[in-house]
Amino acid sequence: MPNSHKKIDSHHHFWDITRLDYPWMPAPPSVLRRNYLPGDLAQLLTRNEIDATVLVQAHQSVEEANFLLDIAEDTDFVAGVVAWVDLTSPDVGDVLDELMKRGKLVSIRHQVEDDPDLAWLSRENSIRGLR
């Protein structure tokens, strides 16, 4: 009986350095300082018999979240998107509602290592945003 389970790689990043600045990215001639888009990944997934991938944010902006969701809508092998939203914003619920309407939002993440406030998670506005 053939294996009917899908293989999903749960963490890939796509970026377009002409759209957003990625301050964490090393300066040229870094191998990272170029666009990484679906065409860069498609053959690798096929060669390794991976059926789908999940895109994970590399920039802390809703603009990038929409960019990744645009890609997800147009790319069959993208199973979902892990995006960033400002959990401390009073509008976080509305922003999440709009992103969820896009269809492939599967999670959100906050990069705590980049947050100067070590107590970020225990702040009242963060707790409110997580609810």
Regions found by a protein language model. Name each.
Residues 1-72:
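An N-terminally biased module of ancient metal coordination in phosphate/nucleic-acid-related enzymes
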